[in-house]
Amino acid sequence: MILTVCLSPCTDITIELDSLNVGRTNIVKSKTLSFTGKALNVAIGVARLGGDPYATGLMYNENGYMFENALDKEGVPFTFIWNKGRVRENYKFIDNKSMLTEVNDVGEEVSEAKTGELLNMVQMLSARSNVTVVSGSLPRGVPAEYYGRLFRAMDPKTIKIADAEGARLFSALDAGVD
């Protein structure tokens, strides 16, 4: 099994316009919603390639069911630690010149109790995993050192992969990744 840990899921809202005119009314040509997060994308990719994925991480009460529906459609089993609030939304505006403008949400804060629950979940699930992938950003209020705590909680037999940058990556490297 390949376990993926998503700490900050997001709804990507891609809006195509003839041109993006700041301060004016713009007409949408097309709009696409994607229920993502780097680790969830990994799990979906593993499923599409015929592998054995399992997704876990943090999810939010108000709109998390849309992520469950998307993972069900892709054949990805999952267990999430549920939090109050909404999944963050990232907006991508594409104009007819193929210029991309992004506006990314920071999302909801997560309590220390919930991050502790996730540590326990990762410890349990990683014992059944050949590979464990932690990928993406952290929710507001969760320090970069949490990446290291996750890797230290993992079963020593699982192959540990971090897809991160900056302080999160250094925290994972200090904890030991493969």
What feature does the model see in each segment?
Residues 131-178:
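Conserved beta-alpha-beta core of the PfkB/ribokinase-like small-molecule kinase fold
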Residues 3, 54, 79, 133, ...:
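Structural detector of well-ordered beta-strand residues that form the stable sheet scaffold
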Residues 8-10, 98, 106-108, 137-140:
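Short glycine-rich anion-binding loops that position phosphate/pyrophosphate groups of nucleotides
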Residues 42, 118-121, 146, 150:
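A general structural detector for well-ordered alpha-helical segments in enzyme core domains, enriched
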Residues 1-56, 65:
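Glycine-rich phosphate/adenosyl-contacting loop at the front of the ribokinase-like
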Residues 5-9, 58-61, 83, 137, ...:
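Cofactor-binding loop segments of dinucleotide-utilizing enzymes, especially the Rossmann-like FAD-
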Residues 48-129:
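Conserved N-terminal subdomain of the carbohydrate kinase-like
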